[in-house]
Regions:
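Helical element adjacent to the flavin cofactor pocket in flavoenzyme catalytic cores
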Residues: 256-321, 326, 519-533
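Flavin (primarily FAD) binding-site architecture
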Residues: 324-339
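Short beta-strand to alpha-helix junction loop
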Residues: 161-172, 200-209, 257-279, 286-288, ...
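Dinucleotide-binding Rossmann-like beta1-alpha1 core, especially the glycine-rich loop
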Residues: 131-242, 395-396, 406-408, 414-418
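C-terminal catalytic lobe of FAD-dependent flavoproteins
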Residues: 255-258, 269, 409-538
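Flavin (FAD/FMN) cofactor-binding and adjacent substrate-gating region
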Residues: 187-194, 202-276, 280-281, 286, ...
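Glycine-rich FAD pyrophosphate-binding loop
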Residues: 103-127
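N-terminal Rossmann-like FAD-binding beta1-loop-alpha1 element of flavoenzymes
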Residues: 84-112
Length: 583
């Protein structure tokens, strides 16, 4: 059950979007019911229903484990250490994908997945804790780089990064297509929907950027279906995005591009479905289980854990391979493992809030996702966008995020997370990166202290007729951005993106960073498997199986590289299977 915003409103500590003069008491009847998104939660029926807690300063919902619940450690009572093949730390979209893929490749392997909370997908994979976009670069301006003339005018836009991002998401579509056909995933309409992606430019400078971006991207096969609505195309713009155009000053120039192959993804529902498939194939999910230590034991790793429900019951397993998909806590786990490859790494946690609208009359007029350029130097998470979302089967609009700062690496983490991660080897990198990104800190602090009327003005910049009574704030999750040494200068740098870190022999691997995150989960899984198992004897037998899962994949090429395959055929075949063919 996803009840993020209801808990947020009910809490005396919940952030208010608007001043008291904008009363929320006049919200239409049925609002609470519409926001409670009940889904098919077959995974957690053993322990009953669960609720996501949206209070930023709250803790994970408490729940008492029964003796036979997934959090039970009785199976370890007779032996101090149990041998397994693979341990996945965390039950988010990354571990779910890696666990399911390896289980498909090696059905007889013993794979254990540890989750410290009461259910999978309660952190960044939760529908309200991420953008819910199938990031393909169709509309996200941060994936295209501006090239300017000496006088400062815009010359052109580069497309290398946006092509790579698009190919990565196509890999995800191919794997989900495979899983649906194999019966691993349920009806695709429970987790993915076709949604037009629109890039928006408001004002002269942004209009010029969108036009140049269109010219550069339209020439590429991946984006040849892109359409443009110039400032003079008022009728077309109103058809594409009615909320954006209604009530807008006719003298204000706007420009839009649209691609119909865009998607909205409920990564929370998708993650639970993958974990469910993992369990049906024989995978072992352990809820209420906190990993407290990772220690080398010859060619394997001893993973120590405890029951978070009772606070008792220490258990140990010896794993041949460990995947750390613990979100922001992946850094802390890799530090516990003591691998030298993680030295110099630190994380900058960035959080924020969504403004959410559930008024069905408003939602019905905006079945699109709209992104626009953000402030210079802004992190990907803070790029403002107005999105149609389907979360747990419920339709809502989300705007934002409004950025903020935190010391937690996870939404249900600890305020000591950042302090625990500071080590002698990453102190200089941290200081250097922060000193070079003071503008980011200033931008986040401005959002922190922005008034309700200021946030309403931001919404109205996109949706001029926005009514304050239709909107409220909910937390937007936490993104732990990477801090590391710049390989060129040796100074600390802030890196937006994700990075797979492995030790020398490929026996432990962790994922650091954030955006584009969940959209690239399949590419990350492929990268993990290739880096860690390519020199292992079983990889030769795996390669044709992986190529069957993701047509176009080769062991020699980089993970997610689909440059040698016809993208039209991918859009058509996966669109039909996943029920996201453009209407």
């Amino acid at each position: 059950i996803l009840a993020q915003a209801i808990a947020c409103q009910a809490s005396p500590h919940a952030p208010e979007l608007f001043p008291r003069s904008y009363t929320m008491s006049s919200q239409k009847p049925g609002l609470e019911k519409r926001l409670s998104a009940t889904g098919d939660d077959s995974i957690n029926q053993l322990g009953g229903s669960f609720k996501g807690n949206s209070m930023r300063h709250g803790t994970a919902p408490a729940k008492t484990a029964k003796a036979n619940d997934p959090g039970c450690f009785s199976c370890f009572a007779s032996v101090p250490v149990k041998d397994v093949d693979v341990v996945c730390i965390g039950a988010g979209i990354m571990s779910a994908t890696v666990g399911l893929m390896i289980k498909e490749l090696e059905p007889k392997w013993k794979i254990v997945m540890y989750e410290r909370l009461h259910a999978p997908a309660e952190e960044s994979s939760n529908g309200f804790n991420n953008a819910g976009t199938g990031h393909s670069g169709f509309m996200e301006p941060n994936y295209t780089k501006e090239v300017k003339n000496p006088d400062g005018t815009l010359k052109t836009v580069t497309t290398e990064k946006v092509e790579h991002v698009c190919e990565q998401f196509l890999s995800s579509r191919l794997f989900w297509d495979y899983c649906v056909k194999k019966g691993h995933l349920p009806d695709p309409s429970t987790f993915i929907h076709q949604t037009n992606h629109i890039a928006l430019g408001i004002g002269k400078d942004q209009v010029e950027f969108i036009k140049k971006r269109y010219e550069a991207m339209k020439a590429k096969d991946l984006f040849k279906s892109m359409e443009i609505a110039l400032p003079e195309d008022k009728t077309k713009q109103a058809q594409w995005a009615p909320l954006i155009c209604a009530g807008r000053d006719p003298n204000q120039p706007i420009c839009m591009t649209k691609i119909v192959h865009g998607t909205d993804v409920d990564f929370g529902a998708l993650c639970k479905a993958k974990v469910n498939a993992f369990m049906k194939l024989g995978g072992d999910l352990r809820l209420f289980t906190l990993v407290t230590n990772i220690k080398r034991d010859g060619t394997a790793w001893i993973v120590t854990s405890k029951n978070t429900s009772t606070g008792r019951g220490v258990a140990k397993v010896r794993a041949k391979f460990v995947f750390v998909g613990a979100g922001g806590w992946a850094l802390l786990m890799l530090q516990k493992a003591g691998i030298p490859q993680v030295k110099g790494y630190m994380a900058l946690p960035v959080t924020g809030d969504w403004a959410v609208c559930q008024n069905p009359e408003v939602v019905a007029r905006h079945h699109v996702k709209v992104y626009a350029p953000g402030a210079p130097g802004a992190p990907p998470m803070s790029m403002p966008h107005l999105d149609y979302r389907t979360i747990g089967g419920k339709e809502v609009l989300l705007f934002g995020p409004f950025g903020s700062m935190t010391f937690k690496f996870l939404r249900y983490g600890s305020n000591l997370d950042a302090l625990k991660a500071v080590k002698c080897h990453n102190l200089c990198s941290t200081i250097g990166a922060l000193s070079r990104n003071m503008g980011l800190a200033v931008m986040l602090m401005k959002d922190v202290f922005k008034s309700g009327s200021g946030k309403l003005a931001d919404i109205r910049h996109y949706y001029p007729e926005a009514d304050a009574e239709d909107w409220t704030l909910i937390p937007a999750g936490v993104r732990a951005q990477i801090i590391k040494k710049d390989p060129k200068t040796g100074k600390g740098m802030l890196q937006f993106g994700t990075e797979v870190v492995t030790n020398d022999d490929g026996t432990i691997c962790g994922l650091l960073g954030a955006s584009p995150g969940a959209s690239t989960c399949v590419t990350i899984a492929l990268d993990t498997i290739t880096k860690c198992f390519k020199d292992k004897p079983q990889f030769k037998a795996w390669a044709p199986k992986i190529a069957q899962m993701i047509p176009g994949w080769t062991a020699e090429g980089p993970a997610g590289d689909l440059s040698g395959i016809n993208c039209d055929s991918i859009y058509a075949s996966t669109g039909a299977t996943l029920k996201i063919t453009p209407k």
